[in-house]
Amino acid sequence: MNDAFLYFALKKAVPNSRRLYFTKGFTLVEMMVAMVVLSLIVLMVAQLTNNAAVLFKSTRRMDTDTEARLIFNRMAVDFGHMLKRSDIDYSTFKSPAATLSATYGGTSLAANLQPGNDECAFYSETDGYFSGSSQPSGQGKAPVALIAYMIANDPVTGTPSLQRMGKGLGWEPSGTAGAWQNVTYLPMQLISQWSDLFNGDPDYKTVGDDVFRLEYTYLLKTSPSAASKLSITPWDTTLGHTSINGFSDVAAIVVTLALLDNTSRKIVFSYTTLTSSLADAANGQSTAVAWNAKVSGSSFATTAGLPVQAASQVRIYERYFYLNTLQESSP
C-alpha cells in the first residue's frame, strides 16, 4: 500500500515532461520582421548621428564666419579713418627699405619685411582708451587714437589670437611719464615713442580668438606706367618713389586672415608649423587664393602638423579696405 501511495503522489507532483518543457519558438517570418525593424532603428540612429555631426561642423563654420565679419568691420572703421599724411611715420607697416624725402633730411628707414604674421600701427580718427587712472580733461583729449594690430598669445588661453590696441592720445603729452602721449611727426618714429609697441604693451585686447594668421598686401593705384597690382611695397617703384609718403600710391590695404575654431584648437598642440605652412604675401599674388589652395590640398594636415579633423576646419578670409583717394596734406 505504501508503494502505491508513493507512486500516485509522485505522479501528481511531477507533471508530464513534454507539457513542462515544451515552448513555442519564433517563426522565420517573425525573425525576418525583427531584423528589418532592428536595421531601421540602426539606420535612424546613424542618420541622427550624421546630422548632428554636420550641424556641429556648420555651427563651427558660422562661428568663424561671424568672427571674421566683426573683425573686418572693426578694421574698416580703423583704416577708413586712418590719418594719411606725408609728415607721419608709417614704418610699422610692412615694406622694404625706404628713403624719406629731402623735407625730412632724406632719412633712411630699415626694411620691415615681417616674416610670419604681420603687424601694423597707425593713427586713426576713432575712439581710444586710457588704461591709466588719469586722462586728458576737456579739450585736451585728442580725437585721434593710436591703433595697432598683431598676432600674440591670448593671456587666458595661451594660443595665438588677433590683438588690437586703441590707445587714447592727448593734444599734448601728459606731465606724468607714461600716462598718455600725443601725435608725433617725422622724422620721429612710432617705435621710438612707444618702445613696447609690439612687445608687451598692456593696452592690447583680444578681438579674434580664432585668428592665428595675419597677412596684408597693398593694392597700388593705376598709373600711366603700371596697372593696379598687389604689392608688398606700399609705393610705386615704377614712378621712382622711395617711401610710403602718406599712402599716396596705395588704393587699398588687403587683409587676409586664417582662423581655426576653439573646438578644433583643443587638439592642436603647436602653431609654429601651422603658421609657417601658410606662406607670406608675395608681389602680384592674392594671399587668400594661395592659402585656400594650400588648405584644400590632400597633404595640408601633414605639412601643417595638424590632426586631420583640425586641418579640415581651417578657414581663410580676405577683404579689401579702400583708402580715401584724397591725400591729407601736412600743415
Which positions does each model-derived feature cover?
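Short secondary-structure boundary/capping segments
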Residues: 2, 55, 271-274
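Short, glycine/small-hydrophobic-rich surface segments
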Residues: 57-58, 63-64, 79-116, 225-231, ...
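Aliphatic-rich helix starts adjacent to a transmembrane/signal segment
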Residues: 26-80
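Surface-exposed loop/linker segments characteristic of extracytoplasmic
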Residues: 98-223, 247-252
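Short linear sequence signals and composition-biased patches located at protein termini or domain-edge surfaces
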Residues: 87, 113, 199-331
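N-terminal leader/signal peptides at the extreme start of proteins
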Residues: 1-26
